[in-house]
Amino acid sequence: DFDNVPSSVMASDQYGNNLYSATANGKQVTTGYITQIGQTGTYIQFPINYLEQEWVSGQPWEYEFWNGGFAISNFHNLTQGDYQNQCSVYWPNGGHSGKNFAVAFGYSDSYNDSQATYDKCAKIYLTDATGYRVVTTNTPVKGTPKYGKFNSVWVCNTTYTYLVMKDGNSFTQGSLSAQKGWFKVVFVALDATGKPTGKEVEYYLANFDSSKDAESGLTNKIRTGWNQVDLSGLGDSVCTVAINFEGSDSSAYGLNTPAYVAIDDIDVTVNE
């Protein structure tokens, strides 16, 4: 769980001003939370993505939450359905087993990631105590991969995503119910080079499409509360898991539904 996370790597407010260089006041979260798994030599890391800023002059590489990644949070504002509340979970008690949880943000599709690198997805790394970090400026982060089996994780919708699915906003085509739409999170196993292994686990966060009732386990509803997801389908030897999203409400520029989910209580068996 995330109950022992130091305050220095947690979201400072429900927006997460300290997740961005311009508003962090010198206390920006970058490499994120990393913690040892039991008494093993394997650590699990939840960083913010370090990527090229394609639309910024000079195209520098920077840690910024808009690149995708994780925000460790304990905020649970249930009424504000916009990006200023992106670090809130739609659950009155915060996390699943305690107050804290992680918000995964970002997605990969043919528009923003034509090479299927999953570079804009939040990624969970199994690694050593050093973790994945910048070794050479303006190049992808590097680290030592460790391996294990991801058994399960608990997930919950964020307030922002839940309320946009429920009510729509200026970016969507209305509520998901009016569209008879759907939205799901996709856990993708990656190898040590960052390439997908071909193993994925899908979990629907909302469904109003009758043709997907059976596969989603949902009929005309948005998922509420914390729910456990079986991740064993990712395989027995995984070093990195990308968290991606797919949905029916999309345009030529990608998803219209906010690409967030809260996670907690990840169960991993390390290969040592």
State where each predicted segment sits.
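N-terminal targeting leaders for non-cytosolic proteins
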Residues: 1-133
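Extracellular beta-strand-rich recognition modules
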Residues: 2, 150-157, 239-247
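Short catalytic/ligand-binding loop motif for oxyanion handling, primarily in non-cytosolic enzymes
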Residues: 10-11, 158-164, 249-252
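Short connector loops at helix/strand junctions that flank enzyme active sites
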Residues: 98, 119, 148-150, 180-182
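Extracellular and analogous surface-interaction loops
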Residues: 124-149, 170-171, 231-236
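Conserved long hydrophobic alpha-helices within structured protein cores
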Residues: 142-161, 196-202
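Short coil-to-beta strand junction motifs in C2/discoidin
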Residues: 164-185
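Terminal, low-complexity interaction segments
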Residues: 180-272
